[in-house]
Amino acid sequence: MEEFLDKLPQMDLMRSEKMTLVQLIIPVESAHRSITYLGELGLLQFRDLNADKSPFQRTFANQVKRCGEMSRKLRFFKDQIDKAGLRCSPRLEIEPDIALGDLERQLADHEHEVLEMNSNSEKLRQTYNELLEFKIVLEKASGFLVSSNTHAIGEEIELHESTYSNNGFIETASLLEQEMNPGHSNQSGLRFISGIINKDKLLKFERMLFRATRGNMLFNQTTSDEEIMDPSTSEMVEKVVFVVFFSGEQARTKILKICEAFGANCYPVPEDTTKQRQLTREVLSRLSDLEATLDAGTRHRNNALNSVGYSLTNWITTVRREKAVYDTLNMLNFDVTKKCLVGEGWCPTFAKTQIHEVLQRATFDSSSQVGVIFHVMQAVESPPTYFRTNKLTNAFQEIIDAYGVARYQEANPAVYSVVTYPFLFAVMFGDWGHGLCLLLGALYLLARERKLSTQKLGSFMEMLFGGRYVILLMALFSIYCGLIYNEFFSVPFHIFGGSAYKCRDTTCSDAYTVGLIKYRDPYPFGVDPSWRGSRTELPYLNSLKMKMSILLGIAQMNLGLILSFFNARFFGSSLDIRYQFIPQMIFLNSLFGYLSLLIIIKWCTGSQADLYHVMIYMFLSPTEELGENELFWGQRPLQIVLLLLAFIAVPWMLFPKPFALRKIHMERFQGRTYGVLVSSEVDLDVEPDSARGGGHHEEEFNFSEIFVHQLIHSIEFVLGSVSNTASYLRLWALSLAHSELSTVFYEKVLLLAWGYENILIRLIGVAVFAFATAFILLMMETLSAFLHALRLHWVEFMGKFFNGDGYKFKPFSFALI
């Protein structure tokens, strides 16, 4: 047996890549180029040799800080380009590599230029808004200034007392000074203040004015015809023009303070119509000049942003790469002579030649007199886990890694999940009509794979696109299982020939009550379509799917135990084989393997034996005669033997292994043997950074802890054998639920609506059926079957052999940043 196992080929996909711990001694002059080339290769994971230092104490902290500042500037440029609504496609021609210092100076110049243009534009926009508000106030407030007194005294009072706030339009002061007579003031006449305010503040503003003046004021307001842009948010704001009439200096002071508090802008409006027109013309002239200036400034700013945008993508990539390089250099140690850097890391064994060639090229390109020293170190800690995947296997590997990363060189469940996962999903989802819908969705994702891979997708769409090959396999297996169940949207078809059953008479009036009669050979593939609608349809399908679920569950659990044997053999743990794998196989198959055998024999012989009675009385009365429940000769003595083996297997799992470990430990420290214990035989829970195969396990041996752990493990397996077998009955339950839901929607919605002559009712029935099929059967049921298949793999299958306490291989790679 050992010779046969040794001759088996290496299972490369089953286990993670062999890893090697390497050390690099890099001269300072070639360090940057060497790390850059290694990042392009992406097959070396560096260890942090400066973990005890803060980020500010590391050698290249200043360079990392400079890269961070450049990243901030690039984000600023990107925000400005997006805010301006520009679409800058990157240059197609290859740009020459730019030095970090030159790029830093360019970014500083561009940022200074853009900030200065933004500042000027903001000032111009503020001035433009004030002029625009002044124009609106002049147009709207003139309607409120109707007075019977149009003499010079009234004008002088109005012009002298009209007030505007500090943030008013200053350039109009020269015209107003010409209009006003500072030498004359009427302290007892009626005055007014005109201005403009945001519409959402109007109600509170009016209420505050009323309370402050105790009602001694007249408030008039009208909505402006055009919205005004807010310079701070660049949003259009609706504003309202107001005119407040009052009397007295004290009221004037209060009103101005309230206007300032509410952000209302006050503007002087002359009462004379001629002066209003003169002032309006002056404001319109200045508005026209400012519009031309703003348009020219916007064009200049967009041209500057376009020149940055053409190279923005390349600059972002360059800065990210440089920052990643310096972050990696900070993980290396400076030699005491300050002439070289020392680094350590993990790489796949197959990549050593490639890494060596890359380091030689870096030495040549940097014109260094001393080459990089690259040599292999003796591994003490457990290496990282690295699986090479493709587009098909990557999604399944991610599903397994979501539960736990495999221990180094541990059997990889993802290899088997590529087939078992979509198949168990299909057992629960089996309907080849629904499977075709899933297949169309998967084919759409595959057809647009190249385009969708370059787009930024939403979280849901990204999840679907990442699992496109999983969906494809689930659809194909669903079509296969649907053909076995003979269900197309719950409707059976005579695809593989005619039925083996027929009615007792031509009317088929007693088909459901009395049943059909068999008149030819069985239906060649899958369930006979005549079972549909018969009186034994549900008992037949229940029995079929329940027994099939048990068979599939026992087969997958046995596969998990077999993988635990290969794990133990690979790591050289003979104790796990003798005292764990063998009794577990005996216990599981003595009970549930025997049940699977009975199911197959009953199917093959057509026996009417009650398997529930057989299994129950196998424990209660093992020596009792089976009578009509006997399926084969010698069944009763076989049951007694299997029952005894199951009882023997429990203490076999529990007692020998802890005592064997204790004996090995005592012999080791008494000097009778000096062999190094394999870690899996000493500690049942190996940490990811513990020694494996090359290091000495120095932890104190605690027999009571080992014994309690083995006791828990044994009890968990014994109870889990029952619960896990029962858990696989979810395959039967969800398959039945999916089938019955499909039947209800087909018969109670589609057929019921189709029975009416009204075309509207038929259309409503088709719409409801399509909605229920799409959202309940194709979305909710798909998600439900997906999660149940996930549970069966994580708990029932992987729980038999998978430790999942490893850590991922995360190489330094530019492709991952």
Swiss-Prot record:
GO terms for molecular function: proton-transporting ATPase activity, rotational mechanism. Its main location: membrane. Disruption phenotype: Lethal. InterPro entries: V-ATPase_116kDa_su (IPR002490), V-type_ATPase_116kDa_su_euka (IPR026028). Residues 1-422, 490-547, 602-639, 780-817 are cytoplasmic. One of its GO terms (cellular component) is vacuolar proton-transporting V-type ATPase, V0 domain. It comes from the Eukaryota. It is a multi-pass membrane protein. The chain crosses the membrane at residues 423-443, 469-489, 548-568, 581-601, 640-660, 759-779. GO terms for biological process: proton-transporting V-type ATPase complex assembly. Pfam families: V_ATPase_I. Residues 444-468, 569-580, 661-758 are vacuolar. Keywords: Coiled coil, Golgi apparatus, Hydrogen ion transport, Ion transport, Membrane, Transmembrane, Transmembrane helix, Transport, Vacuole. Residues 97-133 form a coiled coil. It is found in: Vacuole membrane; Golgi apparatus, trans-Golgi network membrane. Essential component of the vacuolar proton pump (V-ATPase), a multimeric enzyme that catalyzes the translocation of protons across the membranes. Required for assembly and activity of the V-ATPase. Required during cell expansion. V-ATPase is a heteromultimeric enzyme composed of a peripheral catalytic V1 complex (components A to H) attached to an integral membrane V0 proton pore complex (components: a, c, c'', d and e). Belongs to the V-ATPase 116 kDa subunit family. This is V-type proton ATPase subunit a1. It comes from Arabidopsis thaliana.
